[in-house]
């Protein structure tokens, strides 16, 4: 496989060839109408990973709720690799307030959780409005008080233990 890389002429692009936006230009760029809501996430590394993913996919913003760690923090920055400077985020003392804020902006709100009414991710109908996706605590998941406020729930169907 590595031989093909050289024989086929495949190579990684240089930073200059990637033509990446500056942090300022990135903040002003058009975003996907998606809000990620983190409901009492414990791990700073998980929070940093969400920032980095949101940066990669041009996600509109992240809402950090409850005891979810917030930037600036060394362990978040270690995983986020600069994304805390480019991705818009807000802190809400409780997730219910974050859900209300997303709905006020016209977003539908979906829990990423296994419930008796979950829709498999691949069966989710196309969005007609922005979507807010709630990810719950690593152990407890999305809390019942938050589930009751959601427009639905989606789950990834698979055999992997996550």
Residue ranges and their predicted role:
Residues 1-159:
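Post-transcriptional modification and biogenesis factors for structured RNAs
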